[in-house]
Amino acid sequence: YQKLTIEEQVMYFAELHGMKRTDAKASLQDWMKRLDVVGKTTDKVQKLSKGNAQKVQLISTVIFHPEFLILDEPFTGLDPVNTELMMNEIKHLKQEGAMIIFSSHNMSGVEKLSDHLTMLRHGETVLSGATNEIRESFGRTEIYIESPVSDADLLAIDGVVSVEPQGIGRQVLLTDAEVGRQVFSTVAQDGYVPVFAHTAPTLDEIFRREVQGG
């Protein structure tokens, strides 16, 4: 409802679900602060930035304390700071017992929030299950290292597919998780290893493999 003010829109949904206007107004002020919405409750929704409009949409959805929520791309238009704000509030709702279904292409958000996920390609399910179990099912075929060992020494190990720069370290892709033992032995030859993280692929990487590349 773009032509309504923030207050008018939120009050409409709150009263629609049986909430008293006085309670809803007090709750709206609280949510405006919690989500750091820029503007006044008398501002029209159409005048808000995309990010602030997204926050108001969430407030309209949760102000009456629903037990079941469906959120469609809740982090669209938000910068990292505001994404974190929204994510924390969604986590809080989850902790309070709300059942939440949300669709998103933000795999980082999915990984942080979801206990269970379903990935679709052209309307067909390609993956479904507990988030951690899905990640582990792909094997621990990636290693992040911060070490002076050369790319050539790493690539000489049978089972190392690639070595790519990542931040101040490097990402090593393996054919098999067991190759990680040899990589560690090579990296540890000089003694101290600042960082060695042998992990399962992220959901973002799995998404690219299964959905975009499938």
Regions found by a protein language model. Give the residues of each.
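ABC transporter nucleotide-binding domains
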Residues: 1-102, 107-121, 127
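Structural motif detector for alpha-helix initiation sites
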Residues: 6, 131, 200-203
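A generic structural signal for secondary-structure junctions
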Residues: 9, 15-18, 57, 118, ...
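Generic structural signal for individual residues within well-ordered alpha-helical segments
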Residues: 10, 25, 32, 84, ...
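Structural motif corresponding to alpha-helix initiation and N-cap regions
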Residues: 42, 53, 128, 148, ...
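ABC transporter nucleotide-binding domain
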Residues: 87-174
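Short, charged/small-residue-rich alpha-helical element at the C-terminal edge
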Residues: 140-214
